[in-house]
């Protein structure tokens, strides 16, 4: 089975007949193109739910700079004179751009989706990936995503925003690796005003790019979701 999606891709597959695409620097992915890819994979996986073998796919990318606003974002929370795309995921406004690893797992949660459990699994995978580079990430009750401790305050290093449609997931997570934090100063990230954001590189005081941590993230996410992963394609 071949993908007709354009660009420079590394193709991963997990579980049965899964196709995953990666576009990292310098081939940044426009958010709109990534959304079309999600919709295409969502349609295929939704149709496969009635088959014996279910598909499960993940897109990895670094986006071109963009703000995305979740369903709960209010108009006054939008940054001025900036491109903002309204999306159907949960949560509020955030930023995506170069240096940030974005992952979109597209998979079936079965006939009775447990969305909270799914989010916790994604968090677990990201926490384990951070441990692989010596960072202790953790959850905060009532707040999605992955956090780290900075002195007396907590900072978010990974954001999660998902949507489940016809029992199949859309959207996903964003892990701050080596991205500039200045764009976050124009918004209240994820609607949380009493905590900051950080990056892996800032924590470790050395540059860690999305490409460098991708394998660890992929393996940890697959393990947390109880999927078997295989890899094929051009690196």
From Swiss-Prot:
Its main location: cytoplasm. It catalyses: octanoyl-[ACP] + L-lysyl-[protein] = N(6)-octanoyl-L-lysyl-[protein] + holo-[ACP] + H(+). Residues 52-229 form the BPL/LPL catalytic domain. PROSITE patterns: BPL_LPL_CATALYTIC (PS51733), LIPB (PS01313). In the reaction, the free carboxyl group of octanoic acid is attached via an amide linkage to the epsilon-amino group of a specific lysine residue of lipoyl domains of lipoate-dependent enzymes. Gene3D superfamilies: Bira Bifunctional Protein, Domain 2. Pfam families: LplA-B_cat. Its EC number is 2.3.1.181. InterPro entries: aa-tRNA-synth_II/BPL/LPL (IPR045864), BPL_LPL_catalytic (IPR004143), Octanoyltransferase (IPR000544), Octanoyltransferase_CS (IPR020605). The lineage of its organism: Bacteria, Bacillati, Actinomycetota, Actinomycetes, Micrococcales. Substrate binds at residues 89-96, 159-161, 172-174. It is an enzyme of class 2 (transferase). It comes from Tropheryma whipplei (strain Twist) (Whipple's bacillus). GO terms for cellular component: cytoplasm. It is found in: Cytoplasm. The active site is at residue 190. This is Octanoyltransferase. Pathway: Protein modification; protein lipoylation via endogenous pathway; protein N(6)-(lipoyl)lysine from octanoyl-[acyl-carrier-protein]: step 1/2. GO terms for molecular function: lipoyl(octanoyl) transferase activity. GO terms for biological process: protein modification process. Catalyzes the transfer of endogenously produced octanoic acid from octanoyl-acyl-carrier-protein onto the lipoyl domains of lipoate-dependent enzymes. Lipoyl-ACP can also act as a substrate although octanoyl-ACP is likely to be the physiological substrate. The gene is lipB. Keywords: Acyltransferase, Cytoplasm, Transferase. The keyword Cytoplasm applies. The record marks 156 as: Lowers pKa of active site Cys.
